[in-house]
UniProtKB/Swiss-Prot annotation:
Quaternary structure and interacting proteins, as annotated: Homodimer.
Record's keyword annotation contains NADP: no
Similarity comment: family membership: Belongs to the class-III pyridoxal-phosphate-dependent aminotransferase family. HemL subfamily.
Annotated Pfam families: Aminotran_3
EC top class, as a word: isomerase
Protein name: Glutamate-1-semialdehyde 2,1-aminomutase
Alphabetical GO biological process terms: protoporphyrinogen IX biosynthetic process
InterPro entries referenced in this protein's UniProt entry, alphabetically: 4pyrrol_synth_GluAld_NH2Trfase (IPR004639), Aminotrans_3 (IPR005814), Aminotrans_3_PPA_site (IPR049704), PyrdxlP-dep_Trfase (IPR015424), PyrdxlP-dep_Trfase_major (IPR015421), PyrdxlP-dep_Trfase_small (IPR015422)
Location (main, coarse): cytoplasm
């Protein structure tokens, strides 16, 4: 029995399902989840000392690669001064200044401890600002596990085939309108009918929780116009895309400015963190300036701020995101060539250093329905074949993959060699 098998068996005694986040359980791909003990650069090392090229990257934060020495040094320096104060620090002021400089739509920002907190708080703020109750989200998009957002959500809920979670009261769900992603006409029609009741539209500008679905041309622009017309707050959930698809996030990449944005992952350099912010007139409604309450014991945690500040400064160097995107493109082109040679229906998507893999003969991946044409059983086999070849992909057919600046020629060679064998075995 492997160490991972032993640990997973032991974990199930006191941890529900043996994991602390559902997708880690390998339920959607089968087999025993890997337990990792070390990560460095583009690699993770499991408890049985097998090394893998990592395309999960802790689900996005590790854009520099794992254990970047400058980030570790920043955390060590802060450790000498304490773990948490529950009081303001200079680091959180530096972080706020840096985020607002990098993302022009951010006039004010509030730090929290997770992406779920960020989206939950942004929606509460939008409701408080507008005095309206309803929100619009999109089919297949995931914005964390708060009650009002677990309605036809993607990601873990999609993987398990549960459209909404037990424990979410119908009274919460009724205020959440779920529309098709990339369908701007559905948005216009809905707002024409109930726009005066809608506080906000929240959207992943690149839907990273039904694998990786970029916005259709005109979709984000259409959302901006529709929100302006009906006095609706536009929220971009950039927990995944923020600082990854471009330094200024997807809003800079696609040239569309939201009213509020949410961030996580990269902003903490691998530490637990989240943030939300945007227009000053909206953010001034947050306590203690305004009546909308939001608080957190660990918000602005100095360790997370130290790691995040160092990460953001390192990714600010000229050419960083071009290099990240170029590697991702080379890798996806190599996968496509090998799938085509093996006669395997296969489609890839990309937004900077973020990508999606679909076993489908669909011409393009644009909608939730396109995503659902993907052959999940074939992905399961591909996942394990790649794992055997030393490549760790997201253990779900509905999760985005991520590259880091630490991925280079050697990692590309390992990945494509493993893929060539995997596609051949899938015939």
């Amino acid at each position: 029995m492997s160490r991972s098998e032993t640990l997973f068996s032991n974990a199930q005694k006191h941890i529900p399902g043996g994991v602390n986040s559902p997708v880690r359980a390998f339920k959607s791909v089968g087999g025993t989840p890997l337990f990792f003990k070390h990560a460095e650069g583009a690699y993770v090392l499991d408890e049985d000392d097998k090394r893998y090229v990592d395309y999960v990257g802790s689900w996005g934060p590790m854009i520099l690669g794992h254990s970047h020495p400058d980030v570790l040094d920043a955390v060590r320096r802060q450790l000498d001064h304490g773990l948490s104060y529950g009081a303001p620090t200079a680091l959180e002021v530096e972080m706020a200044d840096l985020v607002c400089a990098m993302v022009p739509s951010m006039e004010m920002v509030r730090m929290v401890s997770s992406g779920t907190e960020a989206t939950m708080s942004a929606i509460r703020l939008a409701r408080g600002y507008t005095g309206r109750d309803s929100i619009i989200k999109f089919e297949g998009c995931y914005h964390g596990h708060s009650d009002s957002l677990l309605v036809k959500a993607g990601s873990g809920a999609l993987t398990f085939g549960v459209p909404n979670s037990p424990g979410v009261p119908a009274a919460f769900a009724k205020h959440t309108l779920t529309l098709p992603f990339n369908d701007i006409e559905a948005v216009r029609e809905t707002l024409a009918e109930v726009g005066t009741d809608v506080a906000c539209i929240i959207v992943e500008p690149v839907a990273g929780n039904m694998n990786c679905v970029p916005p259709a041309p005109g979709f984000l622009e259409g959302l901006r116009e529709a929100c302006d017309e009906h006095g609706v707050v536009l929220i971009f959930d950039e927990v995944m895309t923020g600082f990854r698809v471009a330094l200024g996030g997807a809003q800079a990449y696609y040239g569309v400015t939201p009213d509020l944005s949410t961030f996580g992952k990269i902003i903490g350099g691998g530490m637990p963190v989240g943030a939300f912010g945007g227009k000053r007139e909206i953010m001034q409604q947050i306590s203690p300036l305004g009546p909308v309450y939001q608080a957190g014991t660990l918000s602005g945690n100095p360790l997370a701020m130290a790691a995040g500040l160092t990460t953001l400064r390192l990714i600010s160097r000229p050419g960083f995101h071009d290099e990240l995107g170029a590697y991702t493109t080379r890798m996806l082109e190599g996968l496509q060539q090998r799938a085509d040679a093996a006669g395997i229906p296969f489609v890839t998507t990309q937004a900077g250093g973020m990508f999606g893999l679909y076993f489908t003969d669909a011409e393009a991946i644009v909608t939730f329905e396109d995503v659902m044409t993907s052959d999940v059983e074939r992905f399961k086999r591909f996942f394990h074949l790649m794992l055997d070849g030393g490549v760790y992909l997201a253990p779900s057919a509905f999760e985005a993959g991520f590259t880091s600046i630490a991925h280079g020629d050697r990692e590309l060679e390992i990945t494509l060699n493993a893929a060539e064998k995997a596609f051949a075995a899938l015939k």
